[in-house]
Amino acid sequence: VFEFSKKAYLKEISRARTFGFLKDVQALRSMGLALGGSLENAVVIDENKILNPEGLRFENEFVRHKILDAIGDLALVGAPILGDYTAFAGSHDLNHKLTLSVLADAKNFELVDLTAEVVREYQKVFA
């Protein structure tokens, strides 16, 4: 369970690299994707081993990167979300479908004006 705060994000999530399989690199590049990818900014997996000489930054770096993806994807809603998020095998596609589903009906969400006190508490989390 990850409890969001700016400090926790910087320490536990922001350094988690994207990851992919060596067998997919050529196909991705031929489609104009992953052009800036390297062993410095991505974890590359071949068969059952990590190719990066230094290994993983965190034992669960893949999970942490999925959290990073979810934070970025859900930020595209355009307003802070106060709520819980749980995913199994999360992906950009799944996050996109979630966002579309939530925004499809105004009954699925509530826009609220926060009191000054709540705003101050919220700002502490991101300070």
Where are each of the predicted segments found?
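C-terminal regulatory domains involved in ligand/effector binding and gene-expression control
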Residues: 1-127
